[in-house]
Design a protein with these regions (language model features):
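Charged/polar low-complexity intrinsically disordered segments
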Residues: 14, 27, 34-36
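N-terminal beta1-alpha1 ligand-phosphate binding loop
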Residues: 38-61
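Anionic-ligand binding patches
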Residues: 35, 41-44, 79-226
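Cationic, low-complexity basic patches in intrinsically disordered or flexible, solvent-exposed regions
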Residues: 20, 29
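Short glycine-rich, Thr/Ser-proximal phosphate-binding strand/loop in the N-terminal lobe
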Residues: 62-79, 154-160
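Aromatic (phenylalanine/tyrosine) cluster motif
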Residues: 11-18
Length: 226
């Protein structure tokens, strides 16, 4: 697998016609000046993830949670990782936006990629252990697609981060799996939880690995005047 230099990105996704957004200093100032706008906008997070809720609260003062009903198994299997998460994030946002057409809907989707294989959430403890053995002592990639939809306007972007695990013995893996933490996490680990001691290094956006790339999201929200 050809690995990009840390920090570089080159994504395109014709189906949703998105363009990566460069967040300038003036946009950041405008974001600060327009905080009061948040009070008049019905903002919905289309995710039940407690981690995404915690991260979004750092950017948005008030929002509500309406989990999307989009079936992630419907994502086309032939998509590259960046396109995979963009497709899923956009479909999640559209699902909720269709029910709340006046709201601003935020959604995200995260996957772990190693050896060109996409690792989602493990189905059971055995699969969690298998995933962790794949990650042991190696560098993998975490992709998160984030989408924002309001009325007929849709913006989306993707973030990529490299994470390197230290060597994991069978005992360490068994103990971590027994904690239950891997079971609802892409790639079978939570960087913000017990797995932090298993990780040797992170290259790129840390919140992206948790599940919501805050810089990308802030730049997208600025396009909506928020």
């Amino acid at each position: 697998m050809t690995r990009r230099r840390c920090g570089s990105a080159d994504y395109s996704y014709q189906a949703f016609s998105y363009q990566p957004i460069a967040c300038s200093t003036s946009q950041k100032h405008r974001l600060t000046a327009q905080k009061e706008v948040l009070l008049s906008v019905d903002i919905i997070l289309a995710s039940a993830s407690p981690r995404r809720q915690e991260l979004l609260s750092l950017v948005v003062r008030t929002f509500r949670v309406v989990p999307s009903g989009f079936d992630e198994s419907l994502v086309p299997v032939d998509l590259a990782p960046a396109q995979h998460v963009l497709y899923s994030a956009c479909m999640k946002a559209r699902d909720v936006a269709a029910r709340f057409p006046d709201a601003l809907v935020i959604s995200a989707d995260t996957i772990v990629v190693v050896d060109e294989a996409i690792l989602g959430k493990p189905a059971d403890a055995a699969e969690a252990a298998r995933m962790l053995r794949m990650l042991s002592g190696r560098t993998h990639e975490v992709y998160t697609g984030v989408a924002v939809v309001r009325a007929e306007v849709e913006r989306a972007d993707v973030e990529r981060t490299e994470v390197t695990f230290g060597p994991l013995s069978d005992e360490i893996i068994a103990r971590y799996v027994a904690s239950g933490e891997p079971m609802d996490k892409a790639g079978a680990y939570a960087i913000q939880g017990r797995a932090v001691v298993l990780i040797k290094s992170v290259c790129g956006c840390y919140p992206n690995v948790v599940g919501l790339p805050l810089h990308k999201l802030s730049c997208i929200l600025s396009e909506f005047g928020i």
